[in-house]
């Protein structure tokens, strides 16, 4: 079957359906990894940072592909199955995947959450509120993909999974009766077109500070990538925007092009705030209430209060009543790896995902606010093969707000672990702190946690930061199974604590 084939509509080249609907083609599934291709699959060749799917067309054919989707100019005359040339295979992958699953998002209320920090927490708070209102929900976050209480596997560790997985998850959620789905929308996922097959009813913007600049190149490109979520809001949908966040006006401008109803929020919306180690109590004026009402949350910190306000405004936009909102916030279960308290005696041990300068500063400031007398001992590192500016930022943050620091492996990947720790350490010493007195470098994460417990006194706080919920550490030799929470519990048990 060689020759030129008219590009079917589902590749995204044509505005209207024409000859071939992928749902009625003999395709078994859509694949972008040639190793996963089986008989009857369509293989979409993607050019990535480290490999090019066009180099594996032969493998895809050998494994049973019935058609190939390639970038323009990449058609192979020696391959005998249909090949479709497109302008951008990543864009086409998203559209093919949505078509293959029969556009599951069309039957769902899709809610997208973007921002540098707070995406997962905001998603979990909103999900708790929706469930309290009796809705069947799905959620796709950094932490997990979940339908009700059923957790789906995400072996990639990508927050925004590739479009075939996203569309497959949406189809499964729709088939299991979900009405609302919350999706974390990362800058990389948006820029890489993974969410192109989704039309959102509501978008949330939490905040924005520099991050992922190794991928985006500069802050302008990073902001533009984040704002792509609001381009995907349905005409006349809803946009929830943190008006106090830098760059918020850009997101509002994009939302206006979709004629979205914009709801703004900021910390000033919460009054009579009382914060303690066990949670936060504040008052809030709902749109349908004349007098402010008291809300109880088991989360602490101004950043979590902002996340809560985002979820409240989103709930109001979705028509959820204030009683369900209050109860959903109050009944929110522990979010894995987000200010997760492992132990309170004789010292407090907390695991948190904070891995940016702003995130670390926020959590340490919060811990100081609820217990200014306690020493803050921090176990932290930085990821390899990622934005190296993070290392300087992490060093600045802990130098300013911690009392003692153990620098350790996070995900070194192909980099020398000690080199990463040296770069963080250089930032700390530049701030006037001395190695040995203020910080130590212990690459092995278990040993670093053990050392933190050795130096901790009664009443201190040990913060194990950077990995949170994650279940592996990535090294050059490959990933190893890991859990900060489990490791902390095991070491505490060794100490007979």
Map each language-model feature to its residues:
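ATP-dependent carboxylate-amine ligase
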Residues: 1-18, 37-42, 48, 52, ...
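Phosphate-binding loop of NTP-binding sites
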Residues: 8, 91-243, 249-257, 309, ...
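Short secondary-structure boundary segments
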Residues: 70-73, 185, 207, 243, ...
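A short acidic, helix-capping loop that chelates divalent metal ions and anchors anionic groups
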Residues: 77, 147-154, 211-216, 386, ...
């Amino acid at each position: 079957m060689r020759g030129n084939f008219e590009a079917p509509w589902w590749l995204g080249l044509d505005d209207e359906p024409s000859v071939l609907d992928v749902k009625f083609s003999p395709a078994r599934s859509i694949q972008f990894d040639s190793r996963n291709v089986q008989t009857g699959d369509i293989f979409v060749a993607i050019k990535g940072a480290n490999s090019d799917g066009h180099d594996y067309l032969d493998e895809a054919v050998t494994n049973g592909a019935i058609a190939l989707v390639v970038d323009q100019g990449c058609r192979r005359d020696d391959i005998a199955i249909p090949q479709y040339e497109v302008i951008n295979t990543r864009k086409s992958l998203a559209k093919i995947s949505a078509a293959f699953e029969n556009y599951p998002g069309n039957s769902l209320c899709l809610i997208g959450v973007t921002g540098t920090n707070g995406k997962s927490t905001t998603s979990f708070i909103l999900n708790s509120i929706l469930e309290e209102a009796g809705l069947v929900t799905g959620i796709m976050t950094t932490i997990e993909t979940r339908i009700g209480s059923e957790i789906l596997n995400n072996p990639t560790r990508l927050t925004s999974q590739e479009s075939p997985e996203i569309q497959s998850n949406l189809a499964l959620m729709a088939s299991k009766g979900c009405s609302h789905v919350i999706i974390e929308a990362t800058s990389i996922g948006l820029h890489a077109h993974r969410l192109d097959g989704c039309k959102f009813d509501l978008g949330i913007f939490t905040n924005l500070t520099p991050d992922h600049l190794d991928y985006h190149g500069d802050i302008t490109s990073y902001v533009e990538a984040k704002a792509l979520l609001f381009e995907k809001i349905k005409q006349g949908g809803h946009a929830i925007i943190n008006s106090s966040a830098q760059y918020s006006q850009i997101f509002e401008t994009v939302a206006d092009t979709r004629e979205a109803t914009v709801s703004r929020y900021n910390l000033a919306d919460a009054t009579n705030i009382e914060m303690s180690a066990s949670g936060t109590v504040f008052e809030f004026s709902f749109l349908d209430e004349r007098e402010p009402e008291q809300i109880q949350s088991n989360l602490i910190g101004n950043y979590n209060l902002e996340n809560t306000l985002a979820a409240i405004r989103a709930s109001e936009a979705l028509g959820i009543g204030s009683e369900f909102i209050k109860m959903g916030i109050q009944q929110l279960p522990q979010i894995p790896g987000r200010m997760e308290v492992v132990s309170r005696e004789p010292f407090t041990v907390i695991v948190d995902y904070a891995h940016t300068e702003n995130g670390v500063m926020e959590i340490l400031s919060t811990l100081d606010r609820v217990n200014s007398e306690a020493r803050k001992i921090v176990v932290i590192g930085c990821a390899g093969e990622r934005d190296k500016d993070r290392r300087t930022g992490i060093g600045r943050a802990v130098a300013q707000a911690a009392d003692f620091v153990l620098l350790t492996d996070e995900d070194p990947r192909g980099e020398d672990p000690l080199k990463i720790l040296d770069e963080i350490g250089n930032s700390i010493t530049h701030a006037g702190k001395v190695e040995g007195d203020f910080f130590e470098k212990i690459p092995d994460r278990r040993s670093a946690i053990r050392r933190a417990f050795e130096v901790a006194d009664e009443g201190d706080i040990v913060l194990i930061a950077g990995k949170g919920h994650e279940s592996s550490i990535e090294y050059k030799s490959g990933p190893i199974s890991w859990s900060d929470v489990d490791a902390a519990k095991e070491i505490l048990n060794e100490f007979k604590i």
